[in-house]
Amino acid sequence: MAEERKLYMCMRCGRVFSKPEMEILPGIRCPYCNFKIIMKVRSPTVKRIPAV
């Protein structure tokens, strides 16, 4: 299985970064502006399911 890279976005500065970048600082914070509120970015692919 290929390694999936999860991306996060800061709610203050709007920058997108990965988990290894986020682990530079202690705790869960934006590595650029040190803001605590972070959102996980959704994947750009659409998941299609058959209709019932």
UniProtKB/Swiss-Prot annotation:
- Cofactor field: Zn(2+)
EC number(s) recorded for this UniProt protein: 2.7.7.6
Swiss-Prot/TrEMBL catalytic activity: RNA(n) + a ribonucleoside 5'-triphosphate = RNA(n+1) + diphosphate
Major subcellular location class:
cytoplasm
Q: Which Gene3D superfamilies match?
A: RNA polymerase ii, chain L
Entry-linked InterPro entries: RNAP_P/RPABC4 (IPR006591), RPABC4/Spt4 (IPR029040), Rpo12 (IPR023464)
List cellular component terms (GO). cytoplasm; DNA-directed RNA polymerase complex
List locations, semicolon-separated.
Answer: Cytoplasm
BP GO terms, sorted: DNA-templated transcription
Q: How is the cofactor bound?
A: Binds 1 zinc ion.
Which terms does the record give in the GO molecular function aspect? DNA binding; DNA-directed RNA polymerase activity; zinc ion binding
State the source organism's domain of life: Archaea
Per UniProt, the keywords (alphabetical) are: Cytoplasm, DNA-directed RNA polymerase, Metal-binding, Nucleotidyltransferase, Transcription, Transferase, Zinc
Q: Specify which residues bind Zn(2+) according to the UniProt entry for this protein.
A: 13, 30, 33
Q: What does this protein do?
A: DNA-dependent RNA polymerase (RNAP) catalyzes the transcription of DNA into RNA using the four ribonucleoside triphosphates as substrates.
| Assembly description | Part of the RNA polymerase complex.
Q: Which family does it belong to?
A: Belongs to the archaeal Rpo12/eukaryotic RPC10 RNA polymerase subunit family.
The protein depicted here goes by the name DNA-directed RNA polymerase subunit Rpo12
Source organism:
Pyrobaculum neutrophilum (strain DSM 2338 / JCM 9278 / NBRC 100436 / V24Sta)
Q: What are the leading ranks of the lineage?
A: Archaea, Thermoproteota, Thermoprotei, Thermoproteales, Thermoproteaceae
Instruction: Please name the gene that encodes this protein.
Output: rpo12
